[in-house]
Amino acid sequence: MTRRAAVKAPRAGAAARRGSVARRTKETDVAVDLRLEPGEASISTGLPFFDHMLDQISRHGGMALTVRAEGDLQVDAHHTVEDVGIGLGEALRQALEDKAGLARYGHAVVPLDEALVEAVVDLSGRPHLTFNAKLPSGKKFIGGYDVDLTQDFLQALVNHARICVHVNVRYGRNLHHVVEAIFKATARALRAATAREGTALPSTKGTL
């Protein structure tokens, strides 16, 4: 695995709405850069289906996103998927350093043919994930991607962005459709929650 020198992430300003993270361990080498504005996605994790899902986050989340990840895929994809979630969560937290004026809450219901998924987001500052998803039985892998890692990815994202996310898979038969709808719905809810509505902090406590 090629090693990169770790880069200290720049402090994200309120106006920039940008986060940049470089994270290297003995198992993975991950770099994430995002801006909370529509833009291009450039994704490379060594897992084509996961790349496709991260592209959905960029497109439907209304964010420019670059992800580069190299991991011990010869062992398992878990380390790579989870560490990308950690990096994306940390970058998102940087981009949301100033929460004044944000909508805070986001909700989306996304269909993909026969599948229907609901996602709700609260930029609460308190990490929580409810993942209510009974995935279709039988097939477990999509192009080398273990669908069980979807929950692990979201948990890492939630923990490091310090946000609250609820995902409810209402129904679906095709596993690809269900997983893709999970990513799209979560991205759409994030886009709504991170939208600017004014200047006030959306909390009676005075902090998030």
UniProtKB/Swiss-Prot annotation:
Its main location: cytoplasm. Transmembrane segments: none annotated. Residues 7-19 have a biased composition (Low complexity). GO terms for molecular function: imidazoleglycerol-phosphate dehydratase activity. It catalyses: D-erythro-1-(imidazol-4-yl)glycerol 3-phosphate = 3-(imidazol-4-yl)-2-oxopropyl phosphate + H2O. Keywords: Amino-acid biosynthesis, Cytoplasm, Histidine biosynthesis, Lyase. This is Imidazoleglycerol-phosphate dehydratase. Residues 1-22 are annotated as: Disordered.
